Amino acid sequence: WGARSWVCAGSNFAPEAHIALYEACVLEGDFKKGRAVMSAMLPLMRVLEQGGKFVQCIKFGLTLRGIDAGPPRKPLQPLNKDDKRELAEVIRTMNTAISSIKGANT
């Protein structure tokens, strides 16, 4: 993708994925592995960037990790059940894929 750096709010609730990307690209210089990790992260990026619920997704992602970030400030509303289920599934799928990528290269 060509970026030299990246700041992503998702790293607050999915640090392992972001660390895997850093390790692959920066520490190992394995850009094929890095692209695979980033590809596994793209569904999460889509959820975060589409639908106008970025803040709510970040807060719920933190909740899934046991970190209480409180409710979103008004006028924002918390995620509904379907949005929560979708985000949780995207994170689960991403984590499984990245574990597999890391396992295949160790």
Q: Which positions does each model-derived feature cover?
A:
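Catalytic alpha/beta core domains of metabolic enzymes, predominantly
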Residues: 1-49
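Surface-exposed charge patches
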Residues: 23, 60, 89
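Flexible C-terminal active-site loop/helix
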Residues: 67-101
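Short polybasic/polar patches that bind polyanions
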Residues: 25-26, 63, 92
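Eukaryotic N-terminal low-complexity, Ser/Thr- and Lys/Arg-rich leader segments
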Residues: 104-106
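Conserved, mostly hydrophobic/aromatic
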Residues: 34, 58, 87
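Conserved short secondary-structure transition element at the edge of the structured enzyme core
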Residues: 40-76
